[in-house]
Amino acid sequence: MRRFGNISFDSKYIYAEDETGRRWCQSILWYPALKNATDGQRQNYTVGPTGFHWRDLDEDVSFESFEYPDAIPSKVQEFFLTHKEINVAEFARRMGINATLLRNYINGFKKPSAARERQILDAIHQLGREYSSFGITDGYSPKPSPKYLSEP
């Protein structure tokens, strides 16, 4: 197993060097605790036989994860990793696909075909259009309270 050290971060990636000096990276989106951590918290880690551990954050990054084919998330994965407010089960239902399948795409256990990925991205864009047109227009005024619907 390849060993890594000399770990560093920026706003999108975790970087590490292997024993040959080659630099590797992976998305910090896979590790929410590290993404939201302070620089001090990120530097407070230990190195074990199989990876890095942040005790205060209860987070582990394995050495092998730097070599995963999906170390950098796809567009579908990135969207759902950065928009946790989206209910995956309801989004899948709305699209007419199985929620477990969509979760597997998001978590990297399965890879969608190009057509399926396009279908998911189109559904994301449709949701965005619906959000952006919801109730806020130039002539928008809130509905009056029911007690003011008619004057005596």
Which residues make up each language-model segment?
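Motif-centric detector for short Cys/His coordination patterns
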Residues: M1-P152
